[in-house]
């Protein structure tokens, strides 16, 4: 909503400065978004007279002008300024607008300087209206009347120094879509005296010859009409044109400008028909299928029964409450007019506007609701303006429907102010505030009766009245009161899955990976490659064709990001994402997952090249990433099992079957997968490989058993030096190293403090179907140093246990 300061003062008698008015508007809920003060922009521009204009010696289309800007020399003689001008209307005696060097020209976004044009010095500029951004006219420089005072400031003389205020209205404040309503609120906030003159009815001189029929009162609760004969339409007066141009509206003619003025001044949209172009009487009805209307915007709209229209005997003439028709529009030949003031269904106006794609000032106000009691007074006010500006004789009013709404009264306990806002406002102040806002307060006890004005349809209850009082008193007066916390929460603030999500992010970031955040939607092709693509996961209205399905995995998005980086020269990436994936349309099919992707030399040992050599990422890096997530999320490390593609059920097809594995607890609870992505999948995704990745389902990690809280035991540092023994076992190639480690650990958990794999060998000296796995076993004595016999005994048990569980034998 835009308006000028002078326009506001038409309704508010105030001497308050602009800054204070703007601050108060924001404080009372009418947020000021922008103030355009053209007086500062136009300050350097002055009125000047062209004393002489001669042909430029070196250019056919330029003239050298001597300009009188009102300045004088030390002797009191006029001091003329030389300006080179290319405007076709530059001539001797012309009064125009002059800009001296150093002036910023808004229409060209340049700052003037003293220049030389084709060998002739120019010390300023004569300006066109387009260069000042006051109109689109750029055919010549501005021509001012002969009596314009030379040397005076142009903005002040032309009335362009009026600041334009733009406020952001909330949808409930339809009463402030007019300057009149804004002034009312400011008067309640002690910013001045509200001007609310009585609108006197205009006496009709003859019956209105056009009758009105409302077929559906739910679409049109009220409709008022009046004819004015013998009008003379033409340009509107200067004051009205300035009002409209100041807020960005283009003056058209007096009749149309009056309706636009009423829309912004009193929040009362109107429409004016050329009465001679209307055939018969008017009917407010639903449009019929296939009916069309060429509206005032020049577009042809095809209508249906959901659209409310104003029709005559010939057909549709107007889209009710939104836009009039071109055929019955007013022009300079119009002599008889029909002025319409009506009430429309807010819901129907909004639906019709959206369906037809029309955003008009009338729609903006009608879909929020207008003052029903101002329907007829608005018609009277518009009639008087038409008669003052265009002349003519008015008819009597024709009113159809119920124009006046029922009275609304609220029983308002004054204690509600203290209860809801924690401030004390005396009854005298309550009466003053509500009275200035248009409410009527009756009674003097603890409970008063408040009559709601017709223009405040948003006020429905006691809390709304408290809000009205508080916003005028000042929201800054409401004390800060903390909520009563009661007992401290006993349960953790974060849920288990929230805690796991946070820990997973930290663990992967600590491993040098960079977090990515992708859409939860991917293309159908990507979804099918990663086990999705079912119809129940397809979006009914996707925002793009490549975002059509809910993602079954986080990896497609990471692959796309990795390839995008590679295309820009950053091939070595280490990425991760933590987010939701979807395996079905039920709540039980939605999981929180953590996934990561490595490429090139972005291994877990570090990203980028190094003087000591750089190994490329492999499946073991992806495994380490997955295990880091599981450890951070609290997965039981001793229970984790690695299963190959042949051992795990439903192994995903997007992984390389020989270079990947599943992580599970038992045969049925698969926590995730790691390894190299299948080359076929990468080809489908147009991504360069190899890519190593993992995905862990955080929801499937079993909850740790709750144990009674107890103090940690005293730290016992071993008094004796540990002993390390190395073993190399020959086993089948299908045997997992983890099985050998587990077998060694199970020999004696009190003595065996650690088992690690330090070598795996396949090749010369080893059968083709065998491999050598070397482990280091750490033995920690507790109460005394081991003897050689005791160490050999434990070593024998380790060899026997490994042979029993894996069929392996010591390498000779």
From Swiss-Prot:
Lineage top rank: taxon: Bacteria
Binding site for Mg(2+): 458, 464, 467-468
Listed GO MF terms: ATP binding; magnesium ion binding; phenylalanine-tRNA ligase activity; tRNA binding
Ranges of residues in domain B5: 405-480
Coiled coil: none
Cellular component GO terms held in the UniProt record: phenylalanine-tRNA ligase complex
Substrates-to-products reaction catalysed: tRNA(Phe) + L-phenylalanine + ATP = L-phenylalanyl-tRNA(Phe) + AMP + diphosphate + H(+)
Gene3D superfamilies listed in its UniProt record: 3.30.56.10, Bira Bifunctional Protein, Domain 2, Ferrodoxin-fold anticodon-binding domain, Nucleic acid-binding proteins, Phenylalanyl-trna Synthetase, Chain B, domain 3
Gene Ontology process terms (BP): phenylalanyl-tRNA aminoacylation
Keyword set, alphabetical order: Aminoacyl-tRNA synthetase, ATP-binding, Cytoplasm, Ligase, Magnesium, Metal-binding, Nucleotide-binding, Protein biosynthesis, RNA-binding, tRNA-binding
Cellular localisation: Cytoplasm
PROSITE patterns reported for this sequence: B5, FDX_ACB, TRBD
EC number: 6.1.1.20
All residue ranges annotated as the FDX-ACB domain in the record: 718-811
Entry note: cofactor: Binds 2 magnesium ions per tetramer.
Entry annotated with the keyword Ligase: yes
Record keyword Transmembrane helix present: no
Boundaries of every tRNA-binding domain copy: 39-155
Cofactors, names only: Mg(2+)
Family as reported in the entry's similarity comment: Belongs to the phenylalanyl-tRNA synthetase beta subunit family. Type 1 subfamily.
Subunit structure: Tetramer of two alpha and two beta subunits.
NCBIfam families membership: pheT_bact
Official protein name in the record: Phenylalanine--tRNA ligase beta subunit
The gene coding this protein: pheT
């Amino acid at each position: 909503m835009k308006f000028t300061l002078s326009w506001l003062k038409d309704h508010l008698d105030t001497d308050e400065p602009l800054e204070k008015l703007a601050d108060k508007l924001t404080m009372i809920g009418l947020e000021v978004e922008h103030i355009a003060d053209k007086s500062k922009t136009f300050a350097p521009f002055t009125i000047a007279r062209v004393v002489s204009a001669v042909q430029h010696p070196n250019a056919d289309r330029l003239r050298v002008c001597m300009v009188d800007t009102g300045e004088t020399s030390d002797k009191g003689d006029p001091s003329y300024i030389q300006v080179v001008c290319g405007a076709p209307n530059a001539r001797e005696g012309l009064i125009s607008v002059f800009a001296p060097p150093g002036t910023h020209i808004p229409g060209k976004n340049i700052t003037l300087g003293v220049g030389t044009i084709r060998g002739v010095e120019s010390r300023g500029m004569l300006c066109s209206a387009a260069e000042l951004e006051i109109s689109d006219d750029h055919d010549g420089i501005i021509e001012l009347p002969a009596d314009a005072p030379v040397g005076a400031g142009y903005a002040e003389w032309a009335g362009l120094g009026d600041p334009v205020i733009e406020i952001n209205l909330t949808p409930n404040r339809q009463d402030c879509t007019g300057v009149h309503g804004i002034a009312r609120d400011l008067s309640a906030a002690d910013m001045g005296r509200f001007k609310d003159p009585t609108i006197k009815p205009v006496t009709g001189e003859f019956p209105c010859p056009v009758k009105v029929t409302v077929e559906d009162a739910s679409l049109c609760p009220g409709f008022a009409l009046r004819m004015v004969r013998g009008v003379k339409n033409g340009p509107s007066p200067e004051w009205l044109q300035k009002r409209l141009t100041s807020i960005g509206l283009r003056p058209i003619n007096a009749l149309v400008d009056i309706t636009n003025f009423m829309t912004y001044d009193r929040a009362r949209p109107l429409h004016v028909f050329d009465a001679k172009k209307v055939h018969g009487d008017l009917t407010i009805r639903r449009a019929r299928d296939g009916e069309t209307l060429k509206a005032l915007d020049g577009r042809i709209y095809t209508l249906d029964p959901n659209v409310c229209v104003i029709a005559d005997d010939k057909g549709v003439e107007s889209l009710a409450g939104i836009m009039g028709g071109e055929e019955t529009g007013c022009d300079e030949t119009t002599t008889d007019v029909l002025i319409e003031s009506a009430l429309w269904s807010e819901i129907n106006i909004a639906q019709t506007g959206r369906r037809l794609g029309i955003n008009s000032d009338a729609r903006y106000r009608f879909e929020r609701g207008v003052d029903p009691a101002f329907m007829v007074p608005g018609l009277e006010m518009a009639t008087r303006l038409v008669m003052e500006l265009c002349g003519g004789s008015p008819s009597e009013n024709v009113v159809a429907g119920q124009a006046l709404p029922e009275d609304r009264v609220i029983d308002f306990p004054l204690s509600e102010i203290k209860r809801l806002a924690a401030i004390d406002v005396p009854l005298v102040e309550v009466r003053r505030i509500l009275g200035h806002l248009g409410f009527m307060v009756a009674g003097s006890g603890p409970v008063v009766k408040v009559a709601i004005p017709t223009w405040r349809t948003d006020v429905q209850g006691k809390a709304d009245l408290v809000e009205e009082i508080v916003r005028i008193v000042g929201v800054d007066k409401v004390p800060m009161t903390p909520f009563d916390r009661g007992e401290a929460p006993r349960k953790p603030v974060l849920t288990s899955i929230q805690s796991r999500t946070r820990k997973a992010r930290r663990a992967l970031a600590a491993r040098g990976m960079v977090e990515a955040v992708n859409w939860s939607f991917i293309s159908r092709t990507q979804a099918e490659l990663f086990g999705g693509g079912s119809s129940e996961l397809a979006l009914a209205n996707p925002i793009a064709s490549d975002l059509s399905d809910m993602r079954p995995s986080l990896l497609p998005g990471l692959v796309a990001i990795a390839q995008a980086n590679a295309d820009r020269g950053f091939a070595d990436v280490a990425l991760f994402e933590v987010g939701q994936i979807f395996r079905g349309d039920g709540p039980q099919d939605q999981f929180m997952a953590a996934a990561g992707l490595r490429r090139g030399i972005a291994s877990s040992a570090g990203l980028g090249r190094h003087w000591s050599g750089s190994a490329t990422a492999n499946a073991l890096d992806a495994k380490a990433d997955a295990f880091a997530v599981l450890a951070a999320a609290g997965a039981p490390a001793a229970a984790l099992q690695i299963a190959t593609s042949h051992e795990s059920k439903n192994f995903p097809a997007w992984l390389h079957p020989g270079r990947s594995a599943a992580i599970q607890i038992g045969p049925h609870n698969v926590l995730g997968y790691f390894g190299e992505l299948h080359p076929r999948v990468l080809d489908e995704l147009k991504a360069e490989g190899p890519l190593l990745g993992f995905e862990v389902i955080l929801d499937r990690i079993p909850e740790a058993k709750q144990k009674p809280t107890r103090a940690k035991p005293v730290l016992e540092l071993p008094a004796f030096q540990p002993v390390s023994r190395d073993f190399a076992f020959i086993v089948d190639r299908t045997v997992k190293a983890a099985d050998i480690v587990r077998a060694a650990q199970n020999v004696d958990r009190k003595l065996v403090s650690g088992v690690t794999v330090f070598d795996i060998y396949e090749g010369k000296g080893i059968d083709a179907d065998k491999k050598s796995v070397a482990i280091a076993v750490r033995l920690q004595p507790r109460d005394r140093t081991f003897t050689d016999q005791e160490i050999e005994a434990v070593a024998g048990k380790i060899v026997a246990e490994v042979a029993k569980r894996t069929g392996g034998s010591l390498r000779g």
